[in-house]
């Protein structure tokens, strides 16, 4: 299995990316292709690691402040070269660089799976249960039609079933209330269309995401990104409060020591690094979009995520799902569009 890793554009430079690759290679067998500035990377690559990876040199990359459309023009940028390697035989790509550039190039260079109108970013959210919830779209499409959300539901269902091995995953539609009549026009129209699918649970509220009420939560990219960023902010704030309170007194320190295991589980569930990255579903190869501030652990987990996606053949599963849509469901979608 060949995995392409974009070295450039992450907030903390190439070091965490290289360390993440090194750790993953200690635990998994795969071929790693590193794309980026060789001069910046070489000081951090040991002789042992150098013998395990292939290095593609380029100094160009799409900076965070640049427009995503720059990516298609810059054919020597790390993400463009990486995407070409993926298109021409590699199995997956991981990038912690410019997410808009990654999404745009993946769609243009790899192509959309037949039947998918818009690819979506799929992210894992912590829950009180033993397994996380899947949320999509987490930011790829800020303005959506009901048909897009139907696609997201199908892709999220297949991802939960194939990659996460959830048995008969349930899909919920994010709304401001559980009742069928709740939601804006987008939610109401999508709800009508999703009723045709056996996996549809109904509307869910924001709090349900973390209760594990459903396995997959569907929403437009604007709402999904707000949910994601809010969750990250709340988790970070709670962590800071805990740290300050623990340091405030001897009793607090002793109590924290007794609860060390519980705190460890809480940290693991709420730490973005443990989830790796966010798969871009709906394109013809596996692409993982990692957080710009990814540390070595996040990159390591993103690689494991990519390996799972490839081994489960999730792109093929999504393709088959769209090819085998029930005619009555397709007719239902057409009726909704005509109405």
Curated annotation (Swiss-Prot):
GO cellular component terms, semicolon-separated: cytoplasm
InterPro entries according to UniProt: FA_synthesis, Phospholipid_synth_PlsX-like
Pathway entry: Lipid metabolism; phospholipid metabolism
Catalytic reaction annotation: a fatty acyl-[ACP] + phosphate = an acyl phosphate + holo-[ACP]
Enzyme class, first EC level, given as a word: transferase
SUPFAM superfamilies linked to this entry: Isocitrate/Isopropylmalate dehydrogenase-like (SSF53659)
NCBIfam families: plsX
Function, as annotated: Catalyzes the reversible formation of acyl-phosphate (acyl-PO(4)) from acyl-[acyl-carrier-protein] (acyl-ACP). This enzyme utilizes acyl-ACP as fatty acyl donor, but not acyl-CoA.
Protein name as it appears in the record: Phosphate acyltransferase
Provenance organism: Helicobacter pylori (strain G27)
Gene: plsX
């Amino acid at each position: 299995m060949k995995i392409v890793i974009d070295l450039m554009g992450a907030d903390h430079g190439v070091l965490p990316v290289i360390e993440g690759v090194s750790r993953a290679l200690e635990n998994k067998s795969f071929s790693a292709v590193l794309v980026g500035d060789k001069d910046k990377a070489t000081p951090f690559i040991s002789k042992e690691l150098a013998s395990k990876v292939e290095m593609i040199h380029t100094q160009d990359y799409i900076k965070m402040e640049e427009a995503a459309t720059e990516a298609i023009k810059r054919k020597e940028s790390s993400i463009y070269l990486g995407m070409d390697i993926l298109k021409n035989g590699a199995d997956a790509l991981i990038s912690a660089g410019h997410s808009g550039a990654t999404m745009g190039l993946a769609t243009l260079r790899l192509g959309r799976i037949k039947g998918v109108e818009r690819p979506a970013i799929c992210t894992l959210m912590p829950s009180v249960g033993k397994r996380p919830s899947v949320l999509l779209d987490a930011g790829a499409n800020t303005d959506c039609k009901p048909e897009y959300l139907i696609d997201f539901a199908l892709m999220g269902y297949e991802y939960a079933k194939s990659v996460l091995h959830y048995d008969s995953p349930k899909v919920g539609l994010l709304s401001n209330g559980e009742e069928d009549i709740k939601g804006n026009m987008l939610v109401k129209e999508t709800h009508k269309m999703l009723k045709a699918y056996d996996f549809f649970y109904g509307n869910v509220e924001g709090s349900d995401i973390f209760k594990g009420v459903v396995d997959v939560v569907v929403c437009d990219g604007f709402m999904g990104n707000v949910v994601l960023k809010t969750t990250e902010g709340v988790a970070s704030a709670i962590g800071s409060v805990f740290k300050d309170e623990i340091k405030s007194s001897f009793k607090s320190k002793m109590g924290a020591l007794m609860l060390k295991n519980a705190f460890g589980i809480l940290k693991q569930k709420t730490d973005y690094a443990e989830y790796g990255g966010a798969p871009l579903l709906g394109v013809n190869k596996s692409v993982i979009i990692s957080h710009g501030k990814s540390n070595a652990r996040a990159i390591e987990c993103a690689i494991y995520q990519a390996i799972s996606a490839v081994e489960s053949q999730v792109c093929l599963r999504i393709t088959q799902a769209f090819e085998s849509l029930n005619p009555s469901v397709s007719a239902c979608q057409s009726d909704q569009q005509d109405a």
